[in-house]
Amino acid sequence: MSNKGQTLQDPFLNTLRKEHVPVSIYLVNGIKLQGQIESFDQYVVLLRNTVTQMVYKHAISTVVPARAVNFQVDVPAE
C-alpha cells in the first residue's frame, strides 16, 4: 500500500481505537462484522466484540463508525 493511503487510514483507525467507537465493518463478500477496533497494522485489524477477531484489510470493503468522528490528517510536504 502506498504511504499516501496510510496517511488517511491510520489516523482514522487510530481515532476509532482510542475513542472506543463501535464500528460496523463490511467485508467484500457482504458479511457485516461489529465491534470495537482493538489494534491494527499494515495488513490486519483486530476487532473486539465478545471475542477478538483478526480481519485482513484486503477483505474489508467499508468501515462505518456508529457516530461521527473527527480526526487529524498529517499531510506531508511535497
From Swiss-Prot:
| Species per Swiss-Prot/TrEMBL record | Bordetella petrii (strain ATCC BAA-461 / DSM 12804 / CCUG 43448)
Q: Which InterPro entries match?
A: Hfq, LSM_dom_sf, Sm
Q: What does this protein do?
A: RNA chaperone that binds small regulatory RNA (sRNAs) and mRNAs to facilitate mRNA translational regulation in response to envelope stress, environmental stress and changes in metabolite concentrations. Also binds with high specificity to tRNAs.
Subunit structure, briefly?
Homohexamer.
What is this protein's record name? RNA-binding protein Hfq
Q: Which family does it belong to?
A: Belongs to the Hfq family.
Per the record, the gene is hfq
Q: Which PROSITE patterns match?
A: SM
Which UniProt key words apply to this protein? RNA-binding, Stress response
Describe the location of the Sm domain by residue ranges. Answer: 10-69
Q: Which GO terms describe its biological process?
A: regulation of DNA-templated transcription; regulation of RNA stability; regulation of translation, ncRNA-mediated
Q: Which Pfam families match?
A: Hfq
Q: Which HAMAP family match?
A: Hfq
Q: Name one GO molecular function term.
A: RNA binding
Q: Name one GO cellular component term.
A: cytosol
